[in-house]
Amino acid sequence: MTYKDKVAAITKQFRQTVENKYNIIEMKLFGSFARGDYSKTSDIDLMVRLSKVDRNIEEDLFNIAYDLELEYDCVIDVIVLPQNFDNDIMIYQNVQKEGIAI
């Protein structure tokens, strides 16, 4: 399995797990994988917008990512945003420019 295939499997599994529990507004892969300049040591950057976000939901998403990190021996960084937020946030603008919907 190539690293690109591995990332595809991880993002698919992450999305399926999250959408079985929560109402996803938007989910994107961004960073080096979205730009195509990744290496085998690159982390996997994911942005998730949900209709509702609280501390417990955020912690659950981090735990889902952690389980995948252990399973696939990788690093996953997750940004969790509520449906209504200030979309002037710089990181969100970057995700919108370079992100790939998953």
Can you say where each PLM-predicted feature lies in the sequence?
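Catalytic core of pol beta-like nucleotidyltransferases
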Residues: M1-I25, R35-G36, K40, S51-I102
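Glycine-rich beta-strand-to-loop/alpha-helix junction loops that act as flexible
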Residues: F30-S32
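Short beta-strand->loop micro-motif that forms the acidic, two-metal-ion catalytic signature
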Residues: D45-V48
